[in-house]
């Protein structure tokens, strides 16, 4: 069984099941060249768009029918992006809590991934795009809080995130959710000992940002912010570069090395 489990979570915007496959295929090929075999790594996607997208598309169809909207592609991008960001929050409404529904999906995915790795102490890597980075951060925070409170004793160390050794975020918009607090008050998650966090962003991507400037605490926690050029010729210089990271060489090449280093260090 695999030495390392890798969870891949998508971000804001319209997504489909299988979103991770092109990136996983490219990373698998790159890892093979670095001496990491397919059996060394297990992958598990975290697909949550089915929680938020139906309501968004219902509204879009009604609005387009009644208002004959222009710029449909751009409108869908903005609608799903902002809709995801605004919908993913604790509301106190137990009948319609998108936050908890998404976190339940994350937990189920990690439980599934734990079955594919060699032991409860296997190494975990988390790869997160866009809003997925914010979801990941909140899930880790909530999990660590539960562990501290003596809960989750029935979960493995892997599912309690105690074996987390690497985080890769790209097109991350965590900064957008920090402005309700003073800079000095903004604290990141506590990484387990030995874990590293690297972040990638495209300066043309208005939804992806460096993380170290958020606060002194983030500057200390995040190892590096890397500025790259993501997307193809038609999109790399536009805001649409937000969805261009997945198979872009500027991201997948260093990402493969990041994974290989952790795999080689794994017990």
Where are the model-predicted features located?
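Solvent-exposed amphipathic alpha-helical surface segments
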Residues: 30, 34, 113, 146-150, ...
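Serine-dependent carboxylesterase/thioesterase catalytic core
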Residues: 6-26, 90-194
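Active-site catalytic motif of lipid deacylating hydrolases and related acyltransferases
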Residues: 12-15, 26-32, 37-120
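Bulky hydrophobic/aromatic packing residues
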Residues: 30, 38, 78-82, 126, ...
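Glycine-rich loops and low-complexity Gly/Arg-rich segments
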Residues: 30-34, 67-73, 150-152, 191-195, ...
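Lipolytic serine-hydrolase domain surface
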Residues: 45, 51, 166, 172-267
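Proline/glycine-enriched tight loop/beta-turn segments at coil->beta junctions
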Residues: 1-4
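Short, conserved active-site loop motifs that form the nucleotide-linked donor/cofactor pocket
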Residues: 41-43, 124, 223
């Amino acid at each position: 069984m695999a030495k390392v489990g890798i969870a891949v979570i998508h971000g804001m915007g319209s997504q489909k099941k299988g979103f991770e496959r092109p990136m996983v295929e490219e990373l698998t090929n790159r890892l093979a060249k670095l001496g990491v075999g397919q059996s060394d790594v297990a992958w598990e996607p975290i697909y949550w768009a089915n929680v938020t997208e139906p309501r968004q598309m219902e509204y879009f169809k009604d609005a387009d029918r009644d208002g004959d909207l222009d710029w449909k592609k751009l409108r869908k991008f903005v609608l799903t992006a902002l809709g995801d960001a605004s919908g993913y929050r604790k509301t106190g409404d137990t009948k319609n809590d998108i936050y908890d529904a998404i976190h339940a999906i994350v937990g189920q995915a990690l439980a599934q991934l734990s079955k594919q790795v060699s032991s409860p102490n296997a190494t975990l890597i988390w790869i997160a795009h866009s809003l997925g980075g914010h979801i990941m951060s909140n899930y880790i925070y909530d999990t660590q809080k539960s562990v501290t409170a003596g809960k989750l004793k029935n979960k493995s160390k892997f599912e309690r995130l105690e074996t987390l050794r690497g985080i890769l975020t790209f097109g991350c918009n965590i900064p957008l959710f920090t402005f309700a607090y003073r800079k000095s008050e903004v604290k990141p998650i506590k990484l387990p000992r030995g874990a590293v966090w690297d972040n990638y962003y495209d300066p043309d991507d208005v939804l992806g940002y460096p993380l170290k400037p958020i606060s002194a605490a983030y500057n200390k926690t995040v190892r590096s912010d890397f500025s790259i050029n993501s997307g193809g010729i038609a999109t790399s210089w536009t805001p649409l570069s937000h969805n261009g990271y997945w198979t872009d060489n500027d991201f997948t090449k260093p990402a493969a090395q990041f994974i290989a280093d952790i795999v080689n260090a794994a017990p």
